[in-house]
């Protein structure tokens, strides 16, 4: 009895409601959707944290509130900046010449990069074939993006975006989000690689 009490759940894990479209999915499709959802949820949490520490950014875009700014940059389809790649959009957040919302550039660039690793699909069916290398590369890009936000400074010596500087608790919360995204992409890359080797 004591063991059960010690392992008591602190919350519920809820899956998605059944949809008829799920009949056309195999296990890998469902796993891919789950991993992608984990990453996008983490990016949304990251956007909230960054806007809280950098409120001047959502105000640049004329948003009425932090909540509306987050809703805008996590919309589907993504509010991409025209004619630049997702990687270039991430880098735009660290360009001193850029006068726009740096959090938006950073988060939307990451969202677009992750989505590209899933061949720009949000739902997967039996005929979809993901590439392990794209997923693996995206995990490495997330690592680089994490480094940029912590280490990239303006010419005046200030960080472009305040993130994990401050208390150890704040540092840990940011690191957990990046770690969650990297782990999800690496895990999905390994699953796809293992499946490809079995075929």
Stretches with model-predicted labels:
Residues 8-103:
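N-terminal Sec/ER secretory leader and immediately downstream segment
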Residues 59-196:
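Mature extracellular/secreted ectodomains of secretory-pathway proteins
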């Amino acid at each position: 009895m004591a063991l059960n009490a010690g392992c008591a759940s602190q919350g519920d894990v809820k899956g998605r409601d059944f949809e008829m479209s799920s009949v056309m999915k195999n296990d890998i499709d469902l796993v891919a959707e789950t991993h992608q959802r984990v990453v996008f949820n983490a990016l949304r949490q990251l956007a909230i944290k960054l806007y809280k520490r950098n409120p001047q950014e959502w105000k640049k875009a004329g948003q009425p509130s932090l909540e509306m700014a987050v809703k805008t940059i996590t919309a589907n389809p993504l509010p991409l900046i025209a004619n630049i790649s997702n990687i270039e959009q991430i880098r735009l957040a660290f360009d001193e010449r850029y006068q726009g919302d740096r959090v938006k550039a950073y988060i939307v660039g990451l969202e677009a990069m992750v989505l590209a690793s899933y061949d720009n699909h949000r739902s997967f069916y039996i005929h979809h074939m993901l590439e392990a290398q794209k997923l693996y590369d995206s995990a490495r890009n997330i690592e680089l993006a994490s480094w940029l936000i912590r280490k990239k400074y303006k010419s005046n010596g200030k960080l472009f975006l305040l993130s994990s500087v401050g208390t150890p608790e704040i540092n840990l919360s940011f690191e957990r989000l990046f770690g969650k995204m990297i782990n999800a992409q690496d895990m999905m890359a390994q699953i796809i690689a293992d499946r490809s080797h079995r075929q």
